[in-house]
Amino acid sequence: MSRMKYALMCAAFWFAAQSHVAFAQHEGHTMPQPKPAATPKPAASPSASPGTMEEPAAGSDEPMHMDHGIFVMHGDEMFVRLGESETNLIPMGRMGSGTTWQPASTPMPMLHKQSGEWLLMFHYNFVMGVNRQGGPRGVTKFESANWFMPSAIRRVGPGTLELRAMFSAEPFTFPPGGSPLLFQTGETYKGEPLIDRQHPHDLFMELSANYAVPVGERANWFVYFGYPGEPALGPNAFMHRASASENTSAPLSHHLQDSSHISFGVVTTGFNYRWFKLEGSLFNGREPGENRYNFEANPWNSRSVRLQFAPNTNWSMQVSHGLLKNPEALEPGDVRRTTASISYNKPFERGNWASSLIWGRNHESHDGEIFNLNGYVAESTVKFLDRNYLYTRLELVDKNQLLRDDDRLTLGITEHHPSFRIGAYTFGGARDIWNTTATSLAIGSDVTFYSKPSILNPIYGTNPVSWKVFVRIRPSQMTMSRMHGTH
């Protein structure tokens, strides 16, 4: 594999985010636990009234307990109370995208504030930099991947209501046609299929409501509605996974695993008992159109079911299956998608380690042809010494939409949808260079190598190599002492 030289661009960036309101933290869905010791998930103390803090006795190892009504904290763990139950608590770290679970110990950068009966949370991630994709089909672009997600939680009647929104400026900050990403496929631009590009996310990524009611001391029943929203299909969406927290690129397996995370019309209901969650969705399975600023109206004729399992604070697993009716505008035909994933998170002294293994399979039928496409992802991010990150993503994926008509002519291929097994291997690092009580600024870079059938060499080159250099802004990590001072 040829060696690559590139000039590292230096950017001066000044970001001031001072807030006179005390906030705490929680990322797109995660909250870091500074100590590795996992405390049992206790019930809120019946004697603790909302807004109280119970100090442990002098010299005691017992963790501090705080109770602010809807929001309960015990030691290093944060919980959301369901209704008025003293025992039915949801770990905040477990709350993933849509109705997904992730390990409860997952780090979660966020800003939060208690406002009357409401618990308000603000999550965002802003990444900008240079994206260089290698080989004859690669280009170099300056771009920004970003999202902002406010949410609000309060008691309503016998249960707890969560309102969530999510927005992205990518329709304005991605290059025309999408972010360059070698071997990526899915969706369209100007009526043509996107190839070697990742489409921008919609301006409106999620507008949802989730209402959960306790059933006894250990269970709850919930209903989730989103327009747009995320059905019960696939793992935690890639931009919310702690294992991919520093990786700015979508997986090449995105459209075999978690591409339904923006669906214009979703209703999900399910039942959660202790470590298990069983849920089903009725939703619109059509991928968002090229107009990234509107609300789309398509039939809610797709369905899915998912079983999730979280045996302790450091593990979460899911298996799901769904029928998507005509998801692609240019390829009429249904897709039956099956996914399975395992996520692990381990906090340790001055750091955290998050990893995921994900498999997705599309059984597709187009114009009388049947395709079985598989995607495998292994990704991991380790944070160490407070501000340093190393990360990787290794994936193998089947692609059958890589070739245009002129490409097939060049390669002498007559098959309309030839399938190729593609490998992508990303290695990168980042470092926080400036932290305040509210904001964290980091710089980072990664490099990606590929494997592919040699028949693709005339159009992709023998050994293409891609790289990125970026600046990342998000809420800063917080300490427990700072959180105690918040209230």
Regions found by a protein language model. Give the residues of each.
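N-terminal periplasmic/intermembrane-space "pro-region" immediately following the signal or transit peptide
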Residues: 23-123, 138-139, 151-157, 164, ...
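Residues that define the transmembrane beta-barrel architecture of outer-membrane proteins
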Residues: 118, 140-148, 201-207, 261-267, ...
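Outer-membrane beta-barrel "beta-signal"
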Residues: 427, 461-487
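Repeated loop/turn-to-beta-strand initiation elements of outer-membrane beta-barrel proteins
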Residues: 120, 157-162, 217-221, 275-279, ...
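Surface-exposed coil loops of outer-membrane beta-barrel proteins
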Residues: 174-308
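Residues on the lipid-exposed face of transmembrane beta-strands in outer-membrane beta-barrel proteins
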Residues: 110-111, 124-126, 148-154, 207-213, ...
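Detector for outer-membrane/organellar transmembrane beta-barrel domains
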Residues: 273-281, 298, 308-414, 425
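Transmembrane beta-barrel strands of outer-membrane/channel proteins
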Residues: 122, 126-130, 163-169, 223-227, ...
